[in-house]
């Protein structure tokens, strides 16, 4: 079993144990008592969403770095392959010695992109989000809206999540097996049913958090684009 798989399973078991024994709920209720000192519900939700975004920022930045690194590595590998067209026969797997050295050098330049780090970043985001969501559930908000309004917000959030996952869904329906399609459909149906039961405070927390992350993603992409352009110059 790979080290990344063992690490992932260990973190999942720790998280499940903490949730099953009530440790997460106890911490959330203790934190909710401090949040209740703020009388304004809008300030409460904004503070909780900003706190969640700030705690998730290191993992958020690393995952963006990984995404950009994968794109750069793919482009660099294509250029490397084109530069060896004259000395290598890729169809017959007749490769020159310098090609292997260039590929190794390319991989070494992106050695910070590791599956273990990626899984740790994803799990870190999931754990932080789960804890902050439990705090939102533990805080008694005074927001009251018609059920139709809450349903509309839930549908808006569902459409946003589907839009964010459009690339994965497109690949799944084009190249995925029947089992993966059925499994993904069952998970999506369960997730949609679960989100439709959210309270207005939980929905607003998710929407504010998503807006903060989208703004952060836009700023990061603009900053990385200008940095890359300046390096090219």
Curated annotation (Swiss-Prot):
Annotated GO CC locations: plasma membrane
Naturally occurring in which organism (per UniProt): Bacillus subtilis (strain 168)
Known function: Involved in the production of the bacteriocin subtilosin.
Location of this chain's protein in the cell: Cell membrane
GO biological process: bacteriocin biosynthetic process
Membrane topology, record value: Multi-pass membrane protein
Disulfide bonds: none
Segments traversing the membrane: 7-27, 46-66, 116-136, 145-165, 176-198, 203-220
Keyword list, A-Z: Antibiotic biosynthesis, Bacteriocin biosynthesis, Cell membrane, Membrane, Transmembrane, Transmembrane helix
UniProt superkingdom: Bacteria
Name used for this protein in its record: Antilisterial bacteriocin subtilosin biosynthesis protein AlbG
Induction: Transcription is highly induced by oxygen limitation and is under dual and independent control of Spo0A-AbrB and ResDE.
């Amino acid at each position: 079993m790979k080290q990344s798989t063992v690490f992932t399973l260990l973190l999942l078991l720790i998280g499940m144990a903490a949730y099953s024994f009530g440790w997460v709920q106890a911490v959330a209720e203790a934190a909710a008592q401090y949040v209740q000192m703020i009388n304004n519900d809008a300030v409460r939700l904004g503070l909780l969403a900003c706190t969640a975004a700030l705690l998730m920022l290191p993992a958020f930045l690393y995952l963006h770095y990984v995404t950009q690194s994968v794109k750069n590595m793919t482009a660099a590998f294509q250029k490397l392959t084109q530069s060896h067209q004259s000395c290598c026969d890729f169809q017959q797997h007749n490769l020159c010695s310098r090609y292997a050295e260039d590929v190794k050098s390319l991989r070494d330049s992106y050695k910070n992109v590791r599956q273990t780090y990626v899984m740790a970043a994803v799990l870190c985001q999931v754990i932080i989000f789960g804890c902050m969501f439990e705090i939102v559930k533990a805080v008694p908000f005074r927001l009251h809206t018609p059920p139709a309004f809450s349903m509309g917000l839930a549908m808006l959030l569902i459409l946003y999540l589907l839009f964010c996952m459009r690339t994965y869904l497109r690949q799944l329906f084009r190249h995925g097996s029947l089992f993966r399609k059925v499994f993904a459909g069952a998970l999506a149906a369960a997730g949609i049913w679960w989100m439709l039961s959210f309270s207005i405070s939980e929905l607003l927390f998710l929407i504010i958090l998503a807006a903060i992350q989208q703004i952060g993603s836009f700023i990061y992409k603009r900053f990385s684009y200008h940095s890359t352009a300046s390096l090219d110059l």
